[in-house]
């Protein structure tokens, strides 16, 4: 079979596993067609009980040696709890398996065999045959690491909550997609699963993945974003994907739009953003309050800071947890460096000089402000360069068209804000430029390291090679870069924008890194 894998699963040759399948196959509904399952019994609490402490990780730093730069000092990693189980992965494939995940069971007194079992083929999950057809058609041959660990936990019965943290581009979307497709009953024409995303761009992408994997099923999807639905029309699709505000509006309108009592699964993609961001967080919690207490809550993100983790534990009580070791949050395949400039003007001149590198594949340039994104795009276009700008002030239809054009390769360089910093998957992106260092906003002190991780995660996805360049121009931005290096324990090569030799070396290094082996 010609492999059309888009990176959601590994492409290594499938291997058989000697262990029996876990007790995780979905239970058939009364229709006995292999779809859906009986509604789980309601928990004793109201969904807001305190959960266990958040999980940490430890391990050695792995420097790829691309640049001869000293490794900055890093803080001592947190002490691992006795209840953490370290899982190794020996498979090979598209995704470079250099990181480790830790699985924390919600109930350590239960049978450890099923939750700890890691499948090595999709067949071991006892999925419906129509889902297996979709997996094959999508080019999957073998689960990625996060899928291997998460799917047995997600599909086990009775359903359990799950909090999953794994680096960008490792297949989280396909994992929760298979769970939703397995939990809903296609013979019932009403929403039974909801997936919340922080942006319309990410919501549209998630719908595409669900439609691709579920193409041989009778499961329908509905995109719940501003302007996508008539306020008086009833939703007859089984899976809703959308942004918080629109979903709250739908749920508040009651049974004439959809029946909240039928919802079985609630998924938060980029959960830390949904929980922490003012406005989005309130709407996300409102959605939870409008749903039955026995809904399976599934939270996924590439990052979870301690504060967000505390809220996640309350949002998804007694959840199974899958975490990356903290020092493995960034991807080794991404070559990180920073360009030292003297002024804002020199930053633009350096970006313009690097245009030939930006179009080797595709590139995303992240700015702090919308006006900056537009200004840079206008200047580059006036100089004859083909670029586009994208941010939240543009009309919805225009945003969709711009991102579709970039995804299809019509545009090589996209100048944008954080609107696509999270979750967006465009495999051809092999370079990310942080034109402005992400900061914590008004009242914040220092760089927003989580946003930095998400930004550079737009490249180097699914084990592909990629480069990240961050621009500095004053004391604060240089200090912020030092803090990023110290926190991540990842060295960056300094390039002097004033040096013609350095710029030439940078161009050669970038071209070599993006064309040669990672």
UniProtKB/Swiss-Prot annotation:
CC annotations in GO: cellular bud tip; cytoplasmic stress granule; nuclear membrane; nuclear pore cytoplasmic filaments; nucleus
UniProt motif Q motif: location: 120-148
Location (main, coarse): cytoplasm
Region (Disordered): 1-85
Limits of the Helicase ATP-binding domain: 153-322
Membrane topology: Peripheral membrane protein
Domain of life from the UniProt record: Eukaryota
Record's comment describing the protein's domains: The Q motif is unique to and characteristic of the DEAD box family of RNA helicases and controls ATP binding and hydrolysis.
Reported function: ATP-dependent RNA helicase associated with the nuclear pore complex and essential for mRNA export from the nucleus. May participate in a terminal step of mRNA export through the removal of proteins that accompany mRNA through the nucleopore complex. May also be involved in early transcription.
Name of the protein in question: ATP-dependent RNA helicase DBP5
